[in-house]
Every structure is written in C-alpha cells, then in structure tokens.
C-alpha cells in the first residue's frame, strides 16, 4: 500500500496530470426576481420584453455553452497545466444595468445578446460563450495566482506593471490565456472578436490589450504554468 500511495502522489505531481482532470461544470440559470429588485434599486426599469426573452432563450444559452464552453475550459487547463479550484459554478444571467458581467458572483449581463434590447451581439452567439468564458477565467486565474499582493508576489509581470490600474492588471494574464486558447483550438479570429468586444468598455481594457500585445501572450502563460499552488 505504501508503494501504491507513493505512486499516486507521484502521478499528481507529474506535468500534464492537471490537464487530464475534467473542467468545471458551468450551469446557467435565470430568475426575474433579481432583475426586478436590481432595476428598482438602480432606478431603471427592466427593458420591456427582456425578462420574457431570457426565459424563452435560456435553453438556447445553455446549449451554446454546452457546445463550445467545456472545450475552452479544458484547453485553458491543458495550456497552464493547472487544475481548476472548483468543480461546478452557476452563472446567473440578467439584464439589470446596475451590474456588468462579473466573475464573483458569476453574473452575465445578456443585454448585448437580446433582441428586446437591440443587443449588438444578438446575431453573434459565440460572443455569449466568450463572455462566460472570460468571467470563468477570472476565477480560474485567481485560483492560480491569488489576488492583490499575493498575485504580485507570484508574477514579475504584475510587479512590472504595478502602476497600472487594478482593472488593467486583472486582465493581463486573462487576455493572454484567452488568446492562447483560441489560437490552440484554431479560432484566431476569436482573439480579434474578444478584443473588439473589450475595447469599447474603457481605457483600462485598451491598455491591457496593448500590454499583452507588447509582451506577447507567452510570458503571461508561462507565469501561470510555473505558479505554485
């Protein structure tokens, strides 16, 4: 038994073992109650027909993710050789203007994807998957590097760019890994699509993409691979 135990421990320490573990399961759900309460709190009503459209299209959103999302998460893990720190998570979709999409709690604002809101990505279903992938990567990368000072202690690149805004720094490793995933699966056009979706959000995102362009994605990915848990 002692020999078997040593063998099992050795297997978990071998490179590539993390990549063989399953990616986390991402569930997608919706409750109109959140939109009602949130819209009331921010003083902006839910767009007419938006809640009804989400209810009608919820299964569509789930199918979109089921078709492409797991492959993206698995590829990210294969690239970093780091396991996910969670097995399952729930993404709550909503349309409240008070909350953008975020990773913790995992909220996906679907205004951009609805006909009721004249969303710019209503005919780009892959961008819903990209948004959910983006937010899930935030949690994944926090689990690898940690947050704040802990992340900086593990990343020479974060120390190099310590004067940048928190939003910019939080997106450096993410943009690099996201881009590498799309290249790995043969969808380099999605790198351009993700960039085009990010840039209108604000200058912090513009700066993050510029830094990753300057440094290249590989140095950031290498830090994720070498980070000790």
Where are these regions (language model features)?
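N-terminal low-structure segments adjacent to metalloprotease catalytic domains
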Residues: 19-55
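Auxiliary, metal-adjacent structural segments of Zn-dependent hydrolase domains
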Residues: 21-22, 46-105, 185
């Amino acid at each position: 038994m002692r020999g078997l135990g040593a063998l099992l421990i050795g297997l978990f320490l071998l490179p590539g073992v993390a990549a063989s573990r399953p990616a986390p399961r991402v569930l997608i759900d919706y409750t109109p109650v959140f939109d009602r309460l949130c819209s009331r709190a921010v003083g902006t009503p839910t767009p007419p027909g938006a809640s009804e459209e989400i209810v009608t299209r919820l299964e569509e959103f789930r199918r979109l993710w089921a078709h492409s999302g797991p492959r993206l998460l698995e590829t990210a893990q294969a690239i970093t050789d780091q396991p996910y720190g969670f097995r399952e998570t729930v993404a709550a979709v909503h349309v409240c203007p008070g909350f953008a999409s975020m990773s913790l709690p995992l909220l996906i604002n679907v205004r951009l994807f609805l006909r009721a809101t004249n969303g710019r990505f209503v005919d780009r279903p892959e961008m819903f998957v990209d948004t959910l992938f983006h937010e899930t990567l935030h949690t994944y990368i926090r689990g690898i590097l940690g947050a704040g000072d802990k992340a900086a202690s593990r990343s020479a690149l974060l120390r190099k760019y310590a004067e940048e805004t928190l939003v910019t720094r939080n997106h450096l490793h993410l943009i690099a890994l996201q881009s590498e995933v799309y290249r790995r699966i043969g969808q380099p056009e999605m790198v351009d699509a993700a960039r085009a979706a990010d840039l209108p959000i604000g200058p912090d995102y513009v700066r993050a993409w510029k830094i990753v362009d300057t440094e290249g994605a590989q140095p950031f990915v290498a830090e994720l691979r070498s980070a000790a848990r």
